[in-house]
C-alpha cells in the first residue's frame, strides 16, 4: 500500500508547530540538507567570505523623495508629471503632500536624473 502525496500533505498539515519543527530537523539530519531559505544562507555566507566586501557593495535601487516644492510650484508639478506620467491632479497632490515618494526602486542614473530635473525646477529632493 503506497502513500500518496495528498495523504502526506494532509498528515503534515495536521501537525502542530512543535511537531513540524522536530520533523524538519529529523529530515535535515537524515538527508544532510538544510531547510534554510537560499537568500538567508547567502546572507550568512557573505560576511564569512569577506566583511570588507559588504561595506564596499553599492546600492542598486533608489527612491526619489520630494521634500519641498519650493517657490516654483507649477514648474515642479510639470516635472513631476513628466517623470511619473501622473495626471495634473495627481501630480499636484504629490507636490502638495510633501514629503512624498515620486519613484521607488529605480536605478542610480534614473534617480540622479530625476533629482537634477526637480532641483532645477526649484524643489528640494532626497535620493535614498
Swiss-Prot record:
GO CC annotation: cytosolic large ribosomal subunit
Lineage: superkingdom: Bacteria
Keywords assigned: Ribonucleoprotein, Ribosomal protein
Keyword Cell membrane: no
Gene Ontology molecular functions: mRNA binding; structural constituent of ribosome
Transmembrane region(s): none
Subunit text: Homodimer. Part of the ribosomal stalk of the 50S ribosomal subunit. Forms a multimeric L10(L12)X complex, where L10 forms an elongated spine to which 2 to 4 L12 dimers bind in a sequential fashion. Binds GTP-bound translation factors.
Family the entry assigns: Belongs to the bacterial ribosomal protein bL12 family.
Name listed for the protein in its UniProt record: Large ribosomal subunit protein bL12
Gene field: rplL
